[in-house]
C-alpha cells in the first residue's frame, strides 16, 4: 500500500477523487444517493482554488482504494499548522480489510513528519465503526467537548 499526496492537476488523481467521493455519497453515512450531475467538475475546480487543500489517496498497486480530503489550518494556541480531515472514505469493496486503519495511520505519520501539531476530523454520532477506528489511533473527543455546528448559506 502506498500513501499518495494528491496532485489536483493530475487526471488520474481527479478521477479517483470523483469515484471515491461518489462512493462516499452513495453510502448511508454520506447522502445515500449518487453524486448529482455537474458536481464532479465543480469539486475539482473548487479544490484547485483552495491553497490549503491537502489530499491523500491510498494505492494498492492497481487502483486507488481510499481518499482523504484535508484542509490545512493554523492553531493559534500552539502557533503551528494543523489539518482537518474533511472527507475520509475507503471504497466499499475494500472495507473490512484493514485499509481504513493503515491509511489513517499513514496520514498520521505524514502529519508528524511534516510538523503539524494535530489532525482534526468530525464523525457522525451514528457511525460507531468509524468512531472505533479513530479511537484506536488515538483520536478522541475534544477536551473540553465541542459541538460542530453549521449554518447553511
Regions picked out by a protein language model, each given a short descriptive name:
Residues 80-92:
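Conserved acetyl-CoA binding element of GNAT-fold acetyltransferases
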Residues 101, 125-144, 151:
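Conserved active-site alpha-helix within GNAT-family acetyltransferase domains
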Residues 104, 111-122:
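Conserved GNAT acetyl-CoA-binding A-motif
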Residues 94, 98-106:
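Conserved acetyl-CoA pyrophosphate-binding loop and the N-cap/start of the following alpha-helix
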Residues 4-80:
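Acetyl-CoA-dependent GNAT
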Residues 91-93, 97, 125-126:
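Active-site acidic-Proline motif in GNAT/NAT acetyltransferases
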